[in-house]
């Protein structure tokens, strides 16, 4: 893997780690409202870029795939944003980044061979997740559902990467990014309407944060991961944000003085060790 790819992955990791901090900072803006404007702004920025540098049309085979990828990406952000508001940043980011576990399972279900080392890694990771999920602090109230939503968001991002790995084989990254972000925005809009919310529940001063979310964690973060998925396996790409719980929790510790739950500290090593084992035995490129 070239140094350029390593640099892109590093920038993507730092960028996506800023999401949880912004969600906590703008507490008065509903989670789904934040998620919607994040995706819409990211899509608009990429569409504006396309005016200067026109892109090719999406092939017929990939149009349906982009719809599915965008749907799962929208659900990922909707679930993750709500999860961060309902549990600690440490637990939410930890559970949301279980994507490598799900991509490995999905790869196996699609007929790809999965080694015994990968299976062992999955079991270790699941054990750690159980510690985080069913500990005393998270077994009741909002923390419980925050953890559930965050875990489901991990499955959704895994599905997104599975579709992206096929789409990016013959689709430019800008073209894929602007399309999948737009479909994700529409998905979040529908979820917001069905849940009785509004995408206009914000103040003018919040707009700068929508722009920030669209540029930094979306374009510099997820869109850079989309770029790399052409050269790496879905499991390898899904593993990159695993450093997010540490970085995001550190941000929140210094900015908001948020205490990291003991259960998250205990469960995290199991999750990380299991995922590292999974990733090291899942890379195909």
Segments from the language model and where they lie:
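Glycine-/small-residue-enriched transmembrane alpha-helix faces in small-molecule transporters
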Residues: 1-36, 68-71, 75, 79, ...
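Juxtamembrane helix-entry segments on the extracytoplasmic side of multipass membrane proteins
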Residues: 2-5, 27-36, 58-63, 134-156, ...
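Transmembrane alpha-helical segments that form core, pore/gating elements
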Residues: 13, 43-46, 103-105, 109, ...
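Juxtamembrane C-cap of transmembrane helices in multi-pass membrane transport proteins
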Residues: 15-29, 41, 78-87, 95, ...
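Hydrophobic/small/kink-forming positions within alpha-helical transmembrane segments
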Residues: 17, 47, 70, 74-78, ...
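Helix-helix packing/entry segments at the starts of transmembrane helices
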Residues: 37, 92-98, 164-185, 218-254
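Hydrophobic transmembrane alpha-helices of multi-pass small-molecule transport proteins
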Residues: 46, 50, 67, 73, ...
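Specific transmembrane alpha-helical segments of multi-pass solute transporters/efflux pumps
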Residues: 51-90, 96, 131, 214-232
């Amino acid at each position: 893997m070239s140094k350029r790819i390593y640099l892109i992955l590093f920038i993507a990791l730092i960028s996506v780690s800023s999401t949880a901090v912004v969600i906590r900072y703008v507490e008065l803006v509903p989670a789904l409202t934040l998620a919607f404007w994040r995706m819409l702004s990211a899509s608009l920025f990429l569409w504006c870029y396309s005016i200067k540098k026109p892109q090719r049309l999406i092939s017929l085979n990939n149009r349906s795939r982009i719809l599915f990828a965008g749907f799962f990406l929208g659900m990922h952000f909707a679930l993750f944003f709500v999860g961060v508001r309902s549990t600690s940043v440490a637990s939410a980011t930890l559970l949301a980044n279980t994507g490598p576990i799900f991509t490995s399972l999905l790869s196996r279900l699609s007929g790809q061979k999965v080694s015994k080392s990968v299976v062992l890694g999955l079991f270790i990771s699941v054990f750690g997740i159980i510690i985080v999920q069913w500990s005393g602090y998270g077994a009741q109230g909002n923390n419980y559902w925050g953890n559930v939503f965050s875990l489901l968001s991990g499955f959704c991002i895994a599905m997104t990467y599975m579709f992206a790995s096929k789409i990016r084989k013959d689709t430019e990254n800008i073209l894929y990014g602007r399309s999948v972000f737009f479909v994700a925005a529409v998905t979040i809009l529908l979820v917001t309407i069905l849940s009785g919310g509004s995408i206009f529940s914000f103040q003018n001063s919040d707009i700068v944060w929508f722009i920030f979310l669209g540029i930094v964690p979306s374009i510099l973060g997820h869109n850079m991961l989309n770029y790399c998925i052409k050269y790496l396996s879905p499991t390898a790409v899904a593993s990159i944000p695993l450093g997010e719980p540490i970085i995001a929790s550190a941000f929140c510790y210094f900015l908001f003085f948020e205490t990291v739950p003991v259960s998250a500290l205990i469960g995290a090593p199991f999750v990380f060790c299991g995922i590292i084992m999974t990733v090291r035995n899942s890379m195909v490129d």
